[in-house]
Amino acid sequence: MLDFSLYVVTIAAIYAVFALSLNLQAGVTGLLNFGHVAFFGIGAYSSGIVALHGGNWLLGILVGVGVSALLGPAIGRLGRTLAADYWAIVTLAIAECLRLVVSNQTDWTGGPQGISGIVGPFATLTGNAQAIAWLVLCLVVAGVGYLVCETLTRMQFGRVLRLLREEPMLAASLGHNITGEKMRVLAVAGPIAAIGGSLYTLYISYIGPNQLLPIETFLVFTMLIIGGIGNNRGAMFGALVVQLLYAGSRFLKDWVDIPAQSASSIRILIVGLVLTAFLMTRPEGLFAEKLRRIDVRH
């Protein structure tokens, strides 16, 4: 039971990093990026490919961060000529193109079978020692990610992003480059998601095309809605809640006679019911976004 608990919390910490990066876009800036899993996949496959060719695990993370930092602004630049809803569809298409590329490219990405046997940073440890080391690392990375995102959102940069979300025309009239700001936030959020993807791959020692399905992005949106979209603390707690739901659903077979092939569908159903309940009763999530009030005196 201890092993399972350590696994659940570690995965939750990894997804918290993923959720924080999406919160910068969807929560703070109002950018609906339906293909955010692409950045997660870039980090994951970068670590996998580097490890496959005998490279250091840290180098794999750096490669993923670098590629995501370049891809993010390129995707953001597409918003210059596209409306927000069309841009969201384009991001989904880009993520699907990436998934199809890694599915059909066998030399580097392993094709449909993916890349297995990836060596992580704690390969010399065994048992609970390895699990605890991974937990500490992922919690530290999630904590640093939280501090970075919280600092950014409290700075003038964050205030500009919220202005873009609420009043884009006003932001433009004040001289802010809307496309430039979108490119900047994607240049920050993309690498954060890539770090989460790298940690995920190094932790489970495997990455395949199924980890890049669109449902992964929408699962993180669920985390944000449950935790509180626009709130970094909510993003982290939302990741924990969803992972606990995922983990707890595995024990349903001990109480209810559920066919093994239906287990994954039941898991999605439970998450969907919880999401619906939050949208109906507490749409602001567990931690509502707190906006600072500024008193204007004449």
What name fits each language-model region?
Residues M1-H298:
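Transmembrane alpha-helices and adjacent helix-loop boundaries
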